[in-house]
Amino acid sequence: LDVVHEDKTLPVLRNVMRNFYSPLKASDPYLQFVFLTGITKFSQLSIFSELNNLTNISMFPEFGGICGITKEEMLTQMKDYVERLAKANEWTYEEAVAELTQQYDGYHFTWPSPDIFNPFSLLNAFNVNRIENYWFSSGTPTYLIEMLRKFNVMPADIGNMQTLASDFDAPTENMASITPLLYQSGYVTIKDFDRPTLLYTLDIPNKEIRVGLMDSLLPNYVNMRKEAGNTTIAKMYRALYNDDLDEMFRLLQEYLLTVPYCDNANSEGHYQQMLYIIFSLFGRYVEVEVRTPRGRVDVVMKTGKALYLFELKLNKSAEAAMKQIDLKDYASKFALAGLPIVKVG
């Protein structure tokens, strides 16, 4: 994936793959079944021009659970491992299932589809009896960051997108958007399907991917040593968990002071995306530019205890931001959320 998008290396890569797969055609009389899979999709003509009898089963519902571990498989064939994980972390069995589901579940490769767990992360969690972000441990996805810049995609734009199958189950050789790369790399997955319009809803699969992805993107927005940054974020999360908003915002202010000077640093949008990333690292529900009848809320964050409405003002007072929240009555949109509403300017 690091080189598949480069004009110089793509023809070489394509030729190597063509030479590798071409002998299959000559071996046809001796082959009863051939299964091909990979991380990205090439146009069939560019690689498999001689193999004209392939069937792409990527989005066939009957094969929806073929690559991964379904929830049913985990609860039956891996029940002993779930119980062992629960005991090691002093959880009930139900709490362990909920933690595993939130962290590693959520993949769908067609619709309808069973819930699919990331097998690599799930098996690692069972091996050491700890729930952590294993999928990103191999390194930062530099190619993804480069593609996000190329297509001018903001962190908050990743996920919750509606698109046709032809726009994401498509070759990545000459992408017109970043959607095929996000889907085929596992950063977004199918979450819903609208049959009348044939539109699929794509979103980030689970907490592991959201937190790992945002952690990779954060250095592009702040100039802080990673160790110090992670420590500050952990302290912010603990303050939020303890309802100590004064401490959380003190830490947040300290964090924002690390933003280096750049062209984007003089725009509210830069800080909006930064807050989106930081709050996503908390593992919380967060949205930006949330529409209300009288305007848009810059950032909305939801926890188990409250709903936070953020209005951002650059080179203006916090009072001006709070005044706008009240003047445009942003809170009324969330009156039925069943949570206390906290306004932040």
Segment roles from a protein language model:
Residues 1-267, 282:
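Phosphate-binding site recognition
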Residues 17-22, 325-332:
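Short, well-ordered amphipathic alpha-helices
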Residues 35, 308-310, 342-344:
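Hydrophobic/aromatic beta-strand patches that form the interior of the parallel beta-sheet core
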Residues 293-297, 339:
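Short beta-strand or tight-loop elements
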Residues 318, 322, 331-345:
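Nucleic-acid nuclease catalytic cores
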